[in-house]
């Protein structure tokens, strides 16, 4: 690790709880399990725009998903695929975090944790690779630990049963559909009609318009009132209510990607849960309630196994990335893109921004 600057440009939390572009931000210090990456591009996630106000940490770097080139490797790094200086890698980091304020994706350099870092296949573009990190981790955690669906991409289920993905046209939704298909299950989903062809192209076997009031009845009919597994990729109060209506008579499991109001848990035969991607690191999470966590070594062990599987799926060309909308504007453009996500102006695409390089 030579000829690197001591400071770089990044998007950080400001005193008023908003995000701002800052220069002269210290580079992440290379930890034992860290890979230092010269950032090439980032993808935006809805959570990136929510890490403001009380969740913002002054001076902490924001952003989760990145892709770039390895410029430093910690002495105890272990990854699913051997990584060397100069390799292209992608993944997700825990941005806007008071315990690790120098780590975030919206920056010229990223300090990535080894076990959740993926080596980018030679045939994959940087724009596509930028979209993978948080989705791969979060959806793996949701499907194969929280829901614990029968089947796994490398050990498909012997019985093809339906699994509902609410919000199938999101980046997490299209990834979930593919992984369910690879696991020998029947992915069914909801989205807007203009995205029906999109989700079918990723493997959805049945698609329903979430806006129609009769859709829960149609899903119960399609699943013969026996649906047991639901992943809610939108995770809002009304979507939880919708999903509960779809689950079969004997109950099942519901997993969201954000916290849900407990009063909406209206069916005792349903086991509700929500997942938080950064728990995969097995380290303490210093965000405020309800996101704070102590490090869980069991989740870390799951992450090691899961990212090894994900790396093999990538290398074999079995994972298709979400459609990308390549945006302009660098760091200032990222701030505009976060506003677009907040206003729900993005559908069926992932916003990706190239990162300005160090002069």
From Swiss-Prot:
Enzyme's top EC category: oxidoreductase
Pathway in which this enzyme or protein is active: Secondary metabolite biosynthesis
Induction, per UniProt: Expression is positively regulated by the fusarielin biosynthesis cluster-specific transcription factor FSL7, probably via its binding at the 5'-CGGNNNCCG-3' motif present in the promoter of all the cluster genes.
Enzyme nomenclature, EC number: 1.-.-.-
Keywords: NADP, Nucleotide-binding, Oxidoreductase
Disulfide bridge partners, by residue number: none
Domain of life (superkingdom): Eukaryota
Positions bound to substrate: 134-141, 277-281
Traits of the deletion mutant: Abolishes the production of fusarielins F, G and H.
Similarity field: Belongs to the zinc-containing alcohol dehydrogenase family.
Protein's name in the database: Trans-enoyl reductase FSL5
Gene (UniProt): FSL5
